[in-house]
């Protein structure tokens, strides 16, 4: 396929820009950037600007006669009694599944639990532990709870409950008595801060927490690990280990099987340069040869008997025995802790073929003597069961999924309960309402609940196409549309991400936009989900192909999918809109500035956009292993070639962008979206900006906020792609 002339023009312009303005963008960016004041998150001038722009955006989009009905439709979907929660909002421990149940009467939610087999038995089956709304009102705080961050004591009697102020990543952990259903007076309690905790025993915690500014890394994560005993102040806890401030984080985690439990620590120089440590009082830290990925800091490690199961991000050489990246291996923990390490300390459990991958966000779930894990095959999920044979070797079998539940996405509940006798498995795709199954030790699936769709999706179907890129990669994408109506006149909404090895999968609710694709289909649109490089759809190599200096590949892949849609007669230039959040918000900005000939609408949610300064803003330094270091000229050059904020031109012909963020986002700085909108407007380009005062990196923490955000975005898309307006002209 020949490159589009717009691609050539933008690359030439970017090359010139890099050569001329490197000192402007990196070396002297503080002096040359006229919008640095918008990086003052709570600054009076900045907040006044965000309020003015948010009111202007709401005045246009919320005043649209379709807005109220759209918001009501979204709210009905979010609050449907038959709606199934996203798996990442659940956690499992001590034989129970825990959830946060939000609704009209409890917008912040109720922390509840039930047995996996009773998951779909109705509200009566759920035991309420904490009324978060009542707690927030009593204390005068904007409290929310993130269930997967709950940490349970070894005996299962207590839990540390994380309270987030407005959805921020910083939390206050409080000890809770699960039997008495109340917080423990004089129990463990931490100040509001970024922190990671693991129980050592019932009276001792391992905790990394930012108590003072110098205890944070440049990414904002904790760099000091302490051992904290009951009845003492956390600030007085013994320091076990610390890392330099230019590393990413230091976090305790549990390595546990169904027979043993050990507290270890993860020292992250970057998201990909990781070291596992054994730390103990009065002893120097000991490096352990455990190849892990970054999710270990949050989920820990689990296994069976004396072996931990590890997913490899890179090839691993154990005394000359090489295990390939992307595979699952078993590591003998007692031998590793004893220093008795050779090639026989590790064994292969599963190695994917060229079309398969293990999704990064779905580590194996352990049930007694079996391990269950999801494998993607050309981005479609299959379920595997691994068991150790009598000879100690691992055997892997397929687990049959019930009829009508193939051809989509399977998600296992990430269990932190090694004694569990069952767990949950969710099936979904774009047009099939999710079904929740209880998965037993024997590998049997029993349906416990099926969601109720609020939109009739029977008239729609999903197809999968593949494109071949100029460099020989085969990139798939899903397209969802009305049966029998595959033409170029249907407005198309594309969603994407493309980074950190995170795969984009067929789902009933899409990350950051929820059920928007359903409403879009119902209104006459079409939905497209590309599986570009940078993600994890085909394992670590697929991710690594678009890291650092080769990151432009991501945007070329997205553009190639758009061009393929046009070549197949499935869309037209200017009738395609793009939406993405976080790194996907960066993608939205790049496509709007590099390929305005293709995209008639662009929604950039909680985005990175200033790639000359991303490493200086909040958690940005932790992402340099993905994007590159703007302080190093050879790494800054490719960054500035695509950085949206640096590539806005006065004579550019860009689609009107909608940029949305949250004041409480303490992960991706709201200054990215603020500055991008301000620069676009200053150069005479149409742009819309909206900033929610709460919500964190998810932009909303309750159903009302989610429905409002979704309705704003949908009205914008209707105006730009369906109403007959020129996509580059603001709607009246």
Annotate each language-model stretch with its function.
Residues 223, 227-267:
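Polar, glycine-rich mid-to-C-terminal structural blocks
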Residues 105-112, 168-174, 215-226, 270-277, ...:
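Structural motif
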Residues 87-89, 409-732:
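Serine-hydrolase catalytic core recognition
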Residues 48-151, 162, 249-268, 273-279, ...:
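Non-catalytic accessory segments flanking enzyme active sites
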Residues 129-197, 202:
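A conserved hydrophobic secondary-structure block that centers on an alpha-helix together
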Residues 117, 177-181, 229-233, 280-283, ...:
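Short loop/turn segments that connect beta-strands within beta-propeller blades
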């Amino acid at each position: 396929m020949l490159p589009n002339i717009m691609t050539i023009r933008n690359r030439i312009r970017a090359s010139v820009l890099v050569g001329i303005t490197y000192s402007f963008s990196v070396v002297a960016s503080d002096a040359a950037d006229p919008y640095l004041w918008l990086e003052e998150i709570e600054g009076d001038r900045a907040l006044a600007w965000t309020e003015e722009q948010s009111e202007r955006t709401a005045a246009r989009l919320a005043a649209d006669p379709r807005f109220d009905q759209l918001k009501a439709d979204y709210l009905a979907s979010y609050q449907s009694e038959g709606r199934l929660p996203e798996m990442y909002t659940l956690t499992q421990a001590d034989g129970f599944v825990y959830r946060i149940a939000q609704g009209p009467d409890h917008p912040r939610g109720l922390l509840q639990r039930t047995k996996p087999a009773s998951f779909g038995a109705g509200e009566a089956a759920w035991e309420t532990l904490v009324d978060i709304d009542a707690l927030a009102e009593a204390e005068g705080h904007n409290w929310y709870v993130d269930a997967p961050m709950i940490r349970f004591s070894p005996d299962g009697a207590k839990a540390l409950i994380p309270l987030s102020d407005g959805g921020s990543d910083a939390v206050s952990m409080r000890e809770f008595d699960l039997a008495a259903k109340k917080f423990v007076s004089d129990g463990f309690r931490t100040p509001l801060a970024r922190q990671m905790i693991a129980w050592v025993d019932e009276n001792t915690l391992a905790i990394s927490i930012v108590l003072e500014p110098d205890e944070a890394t440049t990414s904002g994560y904790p760099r000091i690990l302490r051992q904290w005993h009951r009845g003492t102040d956390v600030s007085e806890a013994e320091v076990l280990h610390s890392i330099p401030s230019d590393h990413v984080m230091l976090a305790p985690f549990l390595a546990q099987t169904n027979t043993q439990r050990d507290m270890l620590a993860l020292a992250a120089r970057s998201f990909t340069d990781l070291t596992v440590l054994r730390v103990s009082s009065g002893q120097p830290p000991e490096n352990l040869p455990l190849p892990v990925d970054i999710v270990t800091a949050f989920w820990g490690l689990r296994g069976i008997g004396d072996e931990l199961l590890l997913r490899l991000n890179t090839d691993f050489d154990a005394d000359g025995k090489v295990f390939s990246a992307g595979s699952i291996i078993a590591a003998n923990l007692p031998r590793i802790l004893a220093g008795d390490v050779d090639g026989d300390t590790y064994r292969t459990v599963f190695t994917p073929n060229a079309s398969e991958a293990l999704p990064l966000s779905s580590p194996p779930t352990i049930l007694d003597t079996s391990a269950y894990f999801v494998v993607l095959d050309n981005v479609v999920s299959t379920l595997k069961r691994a068991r150790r044979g009598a000879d100690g070797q691992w055997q892997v079998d397929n687990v049959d999924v019930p009829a009508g539940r193939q051809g989509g996405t399977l998600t296992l509940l990430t269990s932190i309960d090694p004694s569990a006798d069952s767990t949950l498995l969710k099936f979904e795709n774009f047009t099939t309402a999710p079904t929740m199954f209880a998965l037993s030790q024997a590998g049997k699936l029993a349906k416990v609940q099926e969601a109720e769709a609020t939109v009739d999706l029977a008239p729609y179907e999903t197809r999968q196409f593949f494109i071949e890129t100029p460099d020989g990669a085969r990139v798939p994408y899903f397209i969802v549309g009305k049966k029998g109506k595959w033409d170029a006149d249907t407005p198309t909404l594309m969603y994407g991400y493309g980074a950190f090895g995170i795969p984009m999968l067929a789902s009933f609710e899409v990350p950051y936009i929820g059920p928007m694709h359903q409403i879009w289909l119902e209104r006459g649109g079409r939905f497209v989900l590309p599986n570009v490089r940078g993600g994890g759809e085909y394992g670590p190599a697929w991710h690594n192909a678009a890291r650092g200096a080769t990151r432009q590949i991501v945007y070329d892949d997205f553009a190639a999918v758009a061009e393929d849609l046009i070549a197949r007669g499935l869309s037209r230039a200017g009738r395609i809109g793009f939406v993405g959040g976080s790194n996907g918000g960066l993608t939205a900005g790049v496509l709007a500035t590099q390929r305005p000939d293709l995209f008639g609408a662009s929604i950039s949610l909680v985005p990175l956009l200033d790639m000359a300064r991303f490493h200086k803003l909040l958690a940005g330094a932790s992402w340099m292993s993905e994007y590159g270091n703007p302080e190093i000229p050879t790494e800054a050059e490719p960054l500035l070639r695509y950085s949206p904020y640096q590539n806005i031109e006065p004579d550019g012909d860009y689609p009107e962008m909608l940029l949305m963020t949250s004041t409480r986002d303490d992960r991706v700085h709201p200054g990215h979206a603020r500055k991008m909108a301000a620069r676009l407007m200053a150069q005479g380009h149409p742009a819309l900006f909206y900033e929610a005062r709460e919500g964190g990196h998810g932009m909303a923490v309750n159903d009302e906020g989610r429905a409002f955000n979704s309705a704003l975005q949908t009205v914008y898309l209707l105006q730009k792609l369906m109403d007959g307006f020129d996509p580059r002209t603001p709607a009246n």
